Amino acid sequence: MLLLARPPKAWHRLFQLQPLALLGTPGGKTQHVRYQLFSTPGPADTGRQGQPQGPGLRTRLLVTALVGAGLGGAWLALRAEKERGRQQQRTEALRQAAVGQGDFSLLDHRGRVRCKADFRGQWVLLYFGFTHCPDICPDELEKLVQVVRQLEAEPGLPPVQPLFITVDPERDTVAAMARYVQDFHPRLLGLTGSAEQIAQVSRSYRVYYSAGPKDEDQDYIVDHSIAIYLLSPDGLFTDYYSRARSAEQITDSVRRHMAAFRSVLR
């Protein structure tokens, strides 16, 4: 007999009957046929050749992601450390250049005498220019105050004092400076003085300037260096930014200098 009966619960597993062997008599006549039951794998199946299944695809992807995140974090930390090292070297090199050494005495746009010591304990962004400048000075001052506003919007950062020193003392009187700075930022201070005082502070910061010839209206252009200076709370020249640097780049640099300064004080 080939198959007498199967328990009802086994029928759902039955999907194929396959002959295993034909057993013959010595005379060559077939005596009977045995069959094996094939079924779908059950919960206890362990895979091919009786070996346990390996980790699933989801597990492998998770492990790969964790390893990648760890390597990425290590690379970013190493990059940040190298950047801090380069910045410290740059800061030391700039300070050794002895830029901004000595004091100055100038009048602000309210007529008050100002010296370098007045800004101790504050971060300062400083620009040299003149009020009759047609385009470059307004653009650079607007960029400077944009940096100040961006830093003001970040909680936990100290305020930055913006300064504007004229290189045209002949025309940039206290009243002229007052009219000019009000268009940029309420905390922007305009500083002016005598020709000798302006020459002294300009030499201190290595600022070149030269007044051009006057036209028939007695108007003239002043050729001068274009740079924004950063002074730390200890009054030291810390960095400078050329016209090619964007407000975002300057903001990021000032932020990093602030972090480095705090780490030294700890």
Swiss-Prot record:
Residues 85-259 form the Thioredoxin domain. One of its GO terms (cellular component) is mitochondrial inner membrane. GO terms for molecular function: copper chaperone activity; copper ion binding; protein-disulfide reductase activity. InterPro entries: SCO1/SenC, Synth_of_cyt-c-oxidase_Sco1/2, Thioredoxin-like_sf, Thioredoxin_domain. It is a single-pass membrane protein. SUPFAM superfamilies: Thioredoxin-like. The chain crosses the membrane at residues 61-78. GO terms for biological process: eye development; in utero embryonic development; intracellular copper ion homeostasis; mitochondrial cytochrome c oxidase assembly; muscle system process; respiratory electron transport chain; response to activity. Disulfide bonds join 133-137. Keywords: Chaperone, Copper, Disulfide bond, Membrane, Metal-binding, Mitochondrion, Mitochondrion inner membrane, Transit peptide, Transmembrane, Transmembrane helix. It comes from the Eukaryota. Residues 79-266 are mitochondrial intermembrane. It holds the Pfam family SCO1-SenC. Residues 42-60 are mitochondrial matrix. The keyword rRNA processing does not apply. Its main location: mitochondrion. It is found in: Mitochondrion inner membrane. Residues 1-41 form a transit peptide. The keyword Transit peptide applies. Homodimer. Interacts with COA6. Found in a complex with TMEM177, COX20, COA6, MT-CO2/COX2, COX18 and SCO1. Interacts with TMEM177 in a COX20-dependent manner. Interacts with COX20 in a MT-CO2/COX2- and COX18-dependent manner. Interacts with COX16. Belongs to the SCO1/2 family. Copper metallochaperone essential for the synthesis and maturation of cytochrome c oxidase subunit II (MT-CO2/COX2) by facilitating the incorporation of copper into the Cu(A) site of MT-CO2/COX2. Could also act as a thiol-disulfide oxidoreductase to regulate the redox state of the cysteines in SCO1 during maturation of MT-CO2/COX2. This is Protein SCO2 homolog, mitochondrial.
